[in-house]
Structures are given as C-alpha cells and as structure tokens.
C-alpha cells in the first residue's frame, strides 16, 4: 500500500515522533511517497524506509496512492487538502504539537491511526472547495 506524506517543516522537537511514524509505516508495510521539500529536510536525519519515494506536485499522485497523511497542525492540513483537492484521496491529519481542531490525531494515536488506514477502518467526511 502506498501513502503520500506532506509536511511543511521538520521541527527538531518532533524528531522522535517522526522517526516512530516512519518506523510504523515500515512495520505496516506501507510505502511512503514524500513531498519533495519535506524529504529534503529529513533525508539525512530520519531513517526512512528503503522504498520511500518523492513527489513534486499533485500530478505525481496516481491511482496507486491510497491516502495522504499530513504531518503538522491545522494549517499544514489545509495545505494538504488544497494540494490534493482534485484527487479523491482520504486525508489523515497527524499533529505532533498542540492538538488542533482539524489535525486531531495526536502522537499517542499514531500507531492506531496507521493500522486503521491499513485495515480501511476509518470514516471520511466530504469536503467542498470554493471555485
């Protein structure tokens, strides 16, 4: 299963959480497709799965992608939704900082959330965008 990963910036305070996140992706046999600017920030400091790939634009998100995971707060989640609005992809928001209103999955729930994604045991809510 292939999932896209989007984030704006790697905060050094979140390094351990990010490592655990990518470890869980590997444990669940998920292949990450990481947004290029985030990949450049983490590639030398985080042990990424060997099958990790990079994407540069929404056009690189093909039918193999099962979901996109946003790592950050509500602003990052809104950026993620804007990025993939022309795709019919579920978006999961994981917040490693203060708990947000939109990105409501906290660090303690990462493993459970990823397992739910793998098992397709999650609910989606429709979103609409102004034209």
Predicted regions and their residues:
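Short internal beta-strands
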Residues: 30-38
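A short, Lys/Arg-enriched amphipathic alpha-helix followed by its capping loop at the start of a domain
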Residues: 20-30
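Catalytic core of DAGKc-family lipid kinases
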Residues: 101-131
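Short glycine/serine/threonine-rich phosphate/pyrophosphate-binding segments
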Residues: 14-15, 75-81
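Short acidic low-complexity segments
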Residues: 52-65
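Short glycine-rich anion-binding loops that position phosphate/pyrophosphate groups of nucleotides
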Residues: 10, 74-76, 99
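N-terminal beta-loop-helix "entrance" segment that forms/cooperates
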Residues: 37-54
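Extreme N-terminal starter segment of soluble prokaryotic enzymes
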Residues: 1-3
């Amino acid at each position: 299963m292939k999932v896209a990963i989007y984030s704006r910036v790697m905060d050094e305070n979140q390094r351990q959480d990010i490592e655990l996140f990518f470890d869980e992706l590997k444990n669940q046999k998920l292949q990450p497709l990481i947004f290029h600017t985030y990949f450049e920030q983490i590639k030398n400091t985080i042990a990424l799965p060997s099958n990790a790939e990079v994407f540069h634009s929404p056009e690189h998100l093909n039918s193999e992608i099962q979901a996109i995971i946003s790592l950050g707060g509500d602003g990052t989640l809104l950026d993620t939704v804007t990025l993939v609005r022309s795709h019919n992809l579920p978006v999961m928001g994981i917040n490693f900082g203060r708990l947000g209103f939109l990105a409501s999955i906290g660090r303690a729930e990462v493993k459970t959330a990823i397992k739910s994604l793998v098992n397709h045991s999650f609910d989606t809510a429709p979103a609409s965008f102004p034209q």
